[in-house]
Amino acid sequence: MNEDFFTSDVTSLFFNSSCGIFPTIAASYPIANYPLSGLTVYFDVSKGGFTFRNSLYNGVGYNGWSKHDNPFLVRPKKDGIFNMSQLEFSYSGGNYFAGAAVHTRHYGVDPDGNQCEPDQSTKKASCAWWVYGEQKVWQAADKEIACMAQYSENTNHDNGCYRYAELGVAYTDSCNQCGLSGQYARFYQGAEYSLELTWRRSLKKWLSVQPSLQYINNRNGDFVVLCTRLTCEF
């Protein structure tokens, strides 16, 4: 999932405090979101500036290698079925996305936001939908500035997260990519606000380092998180 969806340039720059991908999906379903994996049937179709993507997954992701815990399990009756569809449009320096995901089972959460085990899930479908866009607003030689806006909701307010929004801006040149973004997520146990400042520096053509500073506020208090990402391309 992490390689097929939410991988556009500005979106993938940010670490995000809430689950990496949109939390209306990642915090609501135990799906194949890193570090979990699962089998999928995937296809995409492109024509002109449009691309349509679709992935069909087993309803639960796994990260073990035992008989009852491995990425190759397909158990729609117990785990449910999870489907993601997205339509993309590229035009004049911008990329725009709209999509929806449907899960055939409901995974409830306790007051602390902990998700129930798969065998405690119920047969109740829900949907998460999202829209987001990235648009270049300035460009000169190898330098550019792009803005990004995202919004997503889950139809079941008893899921882990039912609303998410983000605004961000990114500067890119031949050796640097810097970004600033603010996020809002409405989890079952309360709201979370976060601010992220990140800088990706290319050391060589194949090597880059990216520190990220995040400020997070939720019902448990205020937190500051420092992360670093090292990327090798070959």
Residue ranges and their predicted role:
Residues 1, 54-58, 98-102, 147-153, ...:
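Transmembrane beta-barrel strands of outer-membrane/channel proteins
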Residues 41, 85-87, 131-133, 147, ...:
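Membrane-embedded beta-strands of outer-membrane beta-barrel proteins
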Residues 41-47, 88-91, 135-137, 171-173, ...:
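Residue-level signature of outer-membrane beta-barrel architecture
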Residues 63, 77, 123-124, 153-164, ...:
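Solvent-exposed loop/turn segments connecting transmembrane beta-strands
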Residues 90-174:
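Long, well-ordered mid-to-C-terminal structural blocks that present hydrophobic/aromatic surfaces
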Residues 222-234:
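Outer-membrane beta-barrel "beta-signal"
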